[in-house]
Curated annotation (Swiss-Prot):
Organism annotation: Burkholderia thailandensis (strain ATCC 700388 / DSM 13276 / CCUG 48851 / CIP 106301 / E264)
Keyword Protein biosynthesis recorded: yes
Record key words, sorted: Aminoacyl-tRNA synthetase, ATP-binding, Cytoplasm, Ligase, Magnesium, Metal-binding, Nucleotide-binding, Protein biosynthesis
Major localization listed first in the record, in broad terms: cytoplasm
Name of protein: Phenylalanine--tRNA ligase alpha subunit
Cellular component annotations (GO), alphabetically ordered: cytoplasm
Cofactor: how bound: Binds 2 magnesium ions per tetramer.
Binding annotation for Mg(2+): E258
PANTHER family: PHENYLALANINE--TRNA LIGASE, MITOCHONDRIAL, PHENYLALANYL-TRNA SYNTHETASE
InterPro entries referenced in this protein's UniProt entry, alphabetically: aa-tRNA-synth_II (IPR006195), aa-tRNA-synth_II/BPL/LPL (IPR045864), Phe-tRNA-synth_IIc_asu (IPR004529), Phe-tRNA_ligase_II_N (IPR004188), Phe_tRNA_ligase_alpha1_bac (IPR022911), Phenylalanyl-tRNA_Synthase (IPR002319), tRNA-bd_arm (IPR010978)
Length: 337
């Protein structure tokens, strides 16, 4: 067989192999145990020494050419496979980069910390208490009688079971119980705020069954309604970082304060200019509540207020729907990062 023809056939066969398996099969035709070149090498023993030397050299040259073609095709197939994998795993550098998002405080938690900071700066302590309360601390101690509508299951989440004294358990409807607990553990003068989660049977665009509230209490021998007005007005100006806030106190009713007032505020400028916005409930602490705190109402007097942290956050940032704070939509939350 013509060696040049064998080399040409091998090169053509190798070039036509579409994958490694086919290439190895084609290799066996030329370099395998029964391959064309192998058979020629086996036949050298039949030749005389001089012819064997000459023919063996020619066959070895042909074999080297076939092996070179084989290795070249192997490399080409390996490169093609690598390029295919790279294409499948390629990163499109024309796409916008995705930055590593930095964590940030929830807007309501920003308000929580800001409120704490402001009141700490004027001498108030910060207290915390249980979210599962007894009806005595949540209602009775705060001068809410047994037949008060707030005690109904339509307004309050009750918990199965009772405490060690047989009192009913519930999810606190405000953080006022912590004021009673704090006052029973500390002697006047008492200046404290109690921020925390509270629960009521309510849910719409401006109400949530779980919401955050901050309540404040100042009790001493000579604390007046004027002190309440001064403290809360100063708080609003610091919280909203503006001095164009007008504040009014509207007569109202709360069982735990007497007299009681709703606190409204109005901006002189901006999109809420000219609108009175309800911001808090307040009043002089009722003598019965002071007595339930273990204090003498003939000697001590004070004021209390309560504000929704979501409400403050909505007004500060211009949020219209309370439910946005609880949906965990990153598009919304990133605006406050």
């Amino acid at each position: 067989m013509d060696l040049d023809q064998i080399v040409a056939d091998a090169q053509q066969s190798f070039e036509g192999a579409a994958d490694i398996t086919t290439l190895e099969n084609e290799k066996a035709r030329f370099l395998g145990k029964s391959g064309a070149l192998t058979e020629l090498l086996k036949g050298l023993g039949k030749l005389d020494p001089e012819a064997r030397k000459t023919e063996g050299a020619r066959i070895n040259v042909a074999k080297q050419q076939v092996e070179a073609a084989l290795n070249a095709r192997r490399q080409a197939l390996a490169d093609a496979l690598l390029n295919q994998r790279l294409a499948a795993e390629a990163i499109d550098v024309t796409l916008p980069g995705r930055g590593a998002g930095a964590g940030s405080l929830h807007p309501v938690m920003r308000t929580w910390e800001r409120v704490e900071q402001i009141f700490r700066s004027i001498g108030f302590d910060v207290a915390d208490g249980p979210e599962i309360e007894t009806d005595w601390y949540n209602f009775t101690a705060l001068n809410s009688p047994e037949n008060h509508p707030a005690r109904s299951m339509q307004d309050t989440f009750y918990v199965d079971g009772k405490d060690a004294d047989g009192r009913r358990l519930l999810l606190r409807t405000h953080t006022s119980p912590m004021q009673v607990r704090y006052a029973r553990m500390n002697r006047p003068p008492i200046k404290v705020i109690a921020p925390g989660r509270t629960y009521r049977v309510d849910s719409d665009a401006t109400h949530s069954p779980m919401f955050n509230q901050v309540e404040g209490l100042w009790i001493d021998e000579n604390v007046s309604f004027a002190d309440l007005k001064g403290v809360y007005t100063d708080f609003l100006k610091k919280f909203f970082e503006r001095d164009d806030i007008l504040v009014r106190f509207r007569p109202s009713y709360f069982p735990f304060t007497e007299p009681s007032a709703e606190i409204d505020m109005m901006f002189e400028h901006g999109k809420n200019a000219g609108k009175w916005l309800e911001i808090s409930g307040s009043g002089q602490v009722h003598p019965t509540v002071i007595r339930n705190m273990g204090l003498d109402p003939e000697r001590y007097i004070g004021f209390a207020f309560g504000s929704g942290l979501e409400r403050l956050t909505m007004l500060r940032y211009g949020v219209q729907d309370l439910r946005l704070f609880f949906e965990n939509d990153l598009r919304f939350l990133r605006q406050f990062a």
